Each structure stands twice: as C-alpha cells, then as structure tokens.
Amino acid sequence: MALQIIAYVVALIMVVGACFSLLAAVGLVRFPDLYTRMHAASKAGTVGSGLLLFAAGLHSLDAAVFVRALAGFVFFVLTAPISAHLLAKAAHQAGYRMSKRSVIDQLPHKEEARRH
C-alpha cells in the first residue's frame, strides 16, 4: 500500500513538473523578446526540471539517490536564475532592446552609464 501511494505521489510530481516545463517551452516560443524568454526559461524551467529530478529521487526509494537528487535540485534552483540574470544583463549591455510592450527598463544603457 505504501509503495502505491509513493507511486501516485511520484506521478503527480512528474505531471506538475512536466506542466511547468511545457509552460517554459511555450514561453520561449510566444514571448516577444530575449528578456521575457529568458525569464520563462529560468523560472518555469527551473521549477519543472527540479520537480522531475525530485520525483526521480523519490521513485528510487534509496536514501542516497534521493539526497543526491535533492542536492541537484537545490543547486539548480540556486544557479539557474543567477546565470539567466547575468546573461540578460550582458545582453542588455550588448544592445539587445526590450520589446515595445515592456513597461520599464531599469538598467542604464551604455551611453548613460558612461556619463555618470
């Protein structure tokens, strides 16, 4: 009975993780500019991948595998948004413009940064 409950929990976590990954993929295709696409990939993709990794660790029924999966999940959650932020900042400094639908640009452009 306990194994069946674990199997259902793993299946539920995998479905939720797959939905987040699907939302990240849709965001990559549908969003208008580099910055919003990176936001979709880093946020929803991180949650989706992390949930799938967590489900795989739980499915193994081995404490060592589960701890490794959990460590990988924590590492991924800590590093993916930071790397996306740094890539977006580098793209902004390289001159990639935001979409016209974007509301505000809080980073100064190269010319403005040099004047200060």
Curated annotation (Swiss-Prot):
InterPro entries: PhaG_MnhG_YufB. It comes from Rhizobium meliloti (strain 1021) (Ensifer meliloti). The lineage of its organism: Bacteria, Pseudomonadati, Pseudomonadota, Alphaproteobacteria, Hyphomicrobiales. Belongs to the UPF0091 family. This is UPF0091 protein R00998. One of its GO terms (molecular function) is sodium:proton antiporter activity.
